[in-house]
UniProtKB/Swiss-Prot annotation:
It comes from Pyrococcus furiosus (strain ATCC 43587 / DSM 3638 / JCM 8422 / Vc1). Residues 32-53 bind DNA. GO terms for molecular function: DNA binding. Induction: Autoregulated. Belongs to the transcriptional regulator TrmB family. This is HTH-type sugar sensing transcriptional regulator TrmBL1.
Length: 341
């Protein structure tokens, strides 16, 4: 790296031109008097003491007190490590500040979307979603890709799993799982894209499966954003599930209770198979004052269309309409739905 380029990099890290020049000069000379630094670097004599004192405050120079006073450069590895730590700290603080500013305006978190390169990495991410989900897993994929997820899916008996695929017959390894709903997808090509969603925390999606020669160049999209994923869940149902044929219903009575679900459309999908009424606890926010609320009661009805999805909960003294995130017609915006029986 040329000397001029080094000086430019140091200035990017917060040093002035004279400070960068003085530190570089000390690296060449070793411990030196201020007059020697002036002579070698060309920094004006009237400025050199202020420059060296500033470098000492910033951790680039040690002052050796004595007669004459010497200035020694701090080991570059120590200096660069401190710069790295400070940069990371500043970036994290900025990230937090930006997110808070964004929320003040938009009322939601910054969407986080990454591109995942490589087919094996995509499989790893999909398996991670299945392993880490706490309440429900939604999958739409060709059966060929579903086989890559078999190992982790077989181990999950504690969460609701809904799988849409181009089944020719029900796989034996899924047939006897009480917590699984299976649906056979329509045959339109756009119905064969892959979506893997865990709760409303993580989502992975991609188009067609790659041929062997294209697996290294393959990429998918990884999403972490509650507000964004709730839209994906909406599309999962209205685009895929509602246009598919259920080939294996949920064995609701054999599932462990209470059963916590993360999206209103998932709740209604379960209620359609479990039947009404059902005792439920809902944690969410009142649309009237935006305050956190918890209600308990019986689900006595539901409404489910491509545009709306809500349940009617009867408490001791009234009927309450509960929707999901983004609700605007209901009384409560539900965030967590707990079926009690």
């Amino acid at each position: 790296m040329l000397e001029e380029e080094i000086l430019q990099k140091l200035q990017k890290f917060g040093l002035t031109k004279y400070e960068s020049l003085a530190y570089l000069t000390l690296l060449k000379l070793g411990p030196s008097k201020a007059t020697d630094v002036t002579k070698e670097s060309g920094i004006p004599h009237t400025r050199i003491y202020d420059v060296l004192s500033s470098l000492a405050r910033k951790g680039f120079v040690d002052i050796v007190h004595g007669t004459p006073r010497l200035y020694a450069p701090v080991n570059p590895e120590i200096v660069l490590e401190k710069i790295r730590e400070d940069l990371i700290s500043d970036i994290e603080r900025l990230k937090k500040a930006f997110q808070e500013l964004y929320r003040e305006v938009h009322g939601e978190e910054l969407p986080e979307i990454w591109t995942v390169h490589g087919f094996e990495n995509t499989i790893d991410r999909a398996q991670h979603i299945i392993r880490s989900a706490k309440h429900d897993i939604l999958i739409n994929t060709p059966y060929e890709f579903l086989e890559y997820l078999r190992g982790v899916l077989e181990k999950r008996n504690d969460v609701l799993i809904i799988v849409i695929s181009n089944f020719s017959e029900i796989p034996l390894w899924l047939r006897n799982k009480n917590n699984v709903i299976l649906a056979r997808s329509g045959q339109a090509p756009w119905l064969l894209g892959t979506w893997v969603i865990g709760d409303i925390n993580y989502a992975l999606f991609f188009g067609t499966l790659p041929e062997d020669k294209g697996k290294e160049r393959f990429y998918s999209f990884w999403v972490k954003s509650t507000r964004l994923i709730q839209n994906y869940v909406h599309w999962f149902y209205t685009m895929y599930f509602d246009n598919s044929e259920i080939v294996k219903p949920l064995n609701y009575e054999r599932m462990e209770k209470p059963l916590t679900l993360s999206h209103i459309r998932t709740v209604i999908t379960v209620l359609k198979q479990a039947g009404l009424p059902r005792n439920i606890e809902v944690i969410g926010r009142s649309l009237a004052d935006k305050k956190q609320v918890t209600i308990k009661g019986k689900v006595i009805d539901y409404e489910y269309t491509p545009l709306t999805a809500n349940i009617t909960v009867k408490t001791d003294n009234k009927k309450i309409k509960v929707g999901g995130l983004g609700s605007y017609l209901e009384d409560i915006e539900g965030e967590s739905f707990i079926l009690l029986d």
